[in-house]
Design a protein with these regions (language model features):
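Active-site mouth loops of central-metabolism enzymes
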Residues: 12-22, 71-80, 103, 116-122, ...
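Conserved, mostly hydrophobic/aromatic
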Residues: 31, 35, 59, 89, ...
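Glycine-rich, proline-tolerant flexible connector loops at the mouths of alpha/beta enzymes
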Residues: 38-52, 218-225, 304-315
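C-terminal helical cap(s) of enzyme catalytic domains, especially alpha/beta-barrels
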Residues: 111-120, 124, 134-140, 224-235, ...
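Long hydrophobic segments that form regular secondary structure
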Residues: 175, 182-243
Length: 362
């Protein structure tokens, strides 16, 4: 299958707080055994728990292929620090990092920091997502601010870097400015993968501008296709290649007592549940749904959130994924080593290197 038609699968490994690294290592290893594209680990300042990015930095050396995508809220964090942390994760994972941008909307979260109030009730979430988009924008610029060959490590002359290949970004956003350059060399992927959960309209706009992967909510293939087309149309309007955007349906799954008939109303497929969609059934039912939706061209794949990670992820990998592999609908191994390669996304060149080359040739 081509990169555009390949089925992409990802899974959330968060849930009730765990403070044992082994828990996350086991789940990430299971997802890797199933050749999933990536795992996500949700995070929020609104609830107690470990820092998702730090946890996945611990998981990185214990895994070889699986992509690692922590949630990073942009509302109360410094963009320069976000960029550095995600770049570091890409280095320690040897090119398997992504990050899922999110926003913090509550007064309780704002009080934890004491630096600024939460958005007043009259202010739309669009302001927070505009800021999140600007963080994604400046992060990409900071990752580009070191050209790939900026490190020369010339012991004879004592030069560690070629200063001509480091660049100021001079970014001015609505709530912050960043001069740059980065303090972390350009990541292995060039730019780690940016993921946005576009289940709200403001988030969808940010996703169209900045995301490599978009998670959407849908209860039918037709609805998924409509949302996917909307996001791609918006991306094209911002001068992006819409075919380079991967759109995954976000689905919460309960593969519990599969011997019991589905609850009333859950027999025909996903149902709305809060900000996401909910599916209850068996591993075979889930495989059938994924196959049907993907064959219809409704989406590029699915991001699955197990209700009970220890139980349901095992059933996803050894049941649903194994069946999809048997049907030749999903790969049996990772063909590449980076998350971008899993997703069929090219490694972008540094915008500053391209500009410098163009200036030389002018």
């Amino acid at each position: 299958m081509s990169a555009r038609t390949s089925l992409h699968l990802a899974a959330e490994i968060g849930g009730p707080p765990h403070y044992d690294a082994g828990h996350y290592l086991r789940l990430a290893g299971l997802a890797e055994d199933g050749a999933l594209d990536y795992v996500t680990l949700g995070d929020s300042f609104a609830r107690p728990g470990l820092d998702a990015l730090a946890v996945l930095a611990r998981v990185a050396p214990a895994t070889d292929r699986i992509g690692l995508v922590p949630t990073v809220t942009t509302t109360h964090t410094e963009p320069f620090h976000v960029s550095s942390a995600v770049a570091t994760l890409d280095w320690v994972s040897r090119g398997r990092a992504g990050w899922q941008a999110d926003v913090s909307t509550t007064e309780a979260e704002a009080r934890l920091f004491g630096r600024r109030p939460a958005a007043p009730p009259a202010a739309p979430p669009a302001a927070l997502w505009q800021e999140a988009g600007e963080v994604a924008d400046v992060s990409g610029r900071l990752w580009d601010s070191w050209e790939d060959d900026a490190e020369i490590r010339d012991a004879a002359t004592g030069r560690f870097i070629d200063r001509d290949k480091l660049h100021y970004v001079d970014f001015e956003g609505s709530t912050f400015t960043v001069k740059g350059p980065a303090i972390v060399p350009r990541p292995p992927q060039g730019r780690p993968v940016t993921v946005i959960d576009a289940t709200t309209a403001p988030a969808r706009e940010a996703a169209a501008r900045h995301a490599d992967v978009v998670h959407i909510r849908a209860t039918t293939p037709e609805q998924a296709a409509a949302v996917r087309d909307e996001v791609r149309r918006k991306a094209a309007g911002h001068g992006r290649d819409p075919e380079a955007l991967r759109v995954l349906v976000a689905l919460t799954v309960d593969l519990g007592d599969v011997e019991t008939a589905p609850e009333p109303g859950l027999e025909s497929g996903p149902q709305l549940a809060g900000r996401g969609t909910y599916f209850r059934g068996g591993p075979v039912d889930l495989a059938d749904l994924i196959a049907q939706w993907h064959r219809s061209g409704a989406a590029d794949g699915f991001h699955l959130t197990p209700i009970t990670p220890e139980r349901d992820l095992e059933r996803i990998v050894n049941g649903t994924v194994a069946l999809l592999q048997h049907r030749s609908l999903f790969r049996t191994f990772h063909p590449g080593g980076t998350l971008r390669e899993h997703l069929g996304l090219v490694r972008p060149a540094s915008r500053y290197a391209a500009a410098r080359t163009a200036a030389k040739e002018a």
